[in-house]
Amino acid sequence: MVVVGAWSLAARQASGLELRPGVVVFAQDPAQRQLAEWAVARFERAGLSPPRVEIHFHADTSGCRGHLGYAQIGRVGVCTALVNEMARRNLLHEMGHIWIDQNVSRAERVRFLELRGLRTWNASTIDWGYRGYEQGAEIISWALGNRILTAQIPDNGAARLAAGFELLTGIELPIPG
């Protein structure tokens, strides 16, 4: 019976655990699964549908192309063994990318660039903090998170971040907590 239970747990981890329809987490550590559940709940608490996404956790940065997080086409990776405020921020940031991909129109992206005084949405020739795509994900992460960590982008005062969040999402900034 124990062997069957261990096999069942291993099979579930290999196939992922569906947290919500369209949201699947791949993690061996229960704390990482709880982190994914927390992040999904943050979207819902704010009145946003969470993105349809696969969430993968990795022990080191090799699963995220050398970074702490990575997002691409409905899949995010969080590359840390720790579950802490930085991991929460990183997961919300990467999920923010996918949410933007699935919910923000081209016209809204143009308005966001204008609001933030940016020239490009995601050109790799521009520094990370001056890309609209990165600023959008960072703003979503800040707005949905605990707001303990400062958004890692220029022009990061609360009023400016709130304006960006409202433009991207169409809703008011949620109360932190």
Language model region names:
Residues 111-177:
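Metalloprotease/metallohydrolase-associated module, dominated by Zn2+-dependent proteases
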Residues 56-88, 101-102:
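Active-site scaffold of zinc-dependent metalloenzymes
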Residues 26-37, 81-90, 127-135:
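Soluble non-cytosolic domains of exported or imported proteins
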Residues 95-111:
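Catalytic Zn2+-binding segment of zinc metalloproteases
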Residues 3-21:
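C-terminal region of N-terminal signal peptides and the immediate post-cleavage residues
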Residues 77, 98-100, 138-143:
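Structural recognition of the beta-strand scaffold that forms the well-ordered cores
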Residues 46-58, 107-113, 148-156:
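Surface-exposed patches in mature extracellular/periplasmic domains of secreted proteins
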Residues 16-72:
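Auxiliary, metal-adjacent structural segments of Zn-dependent hydrolase domains
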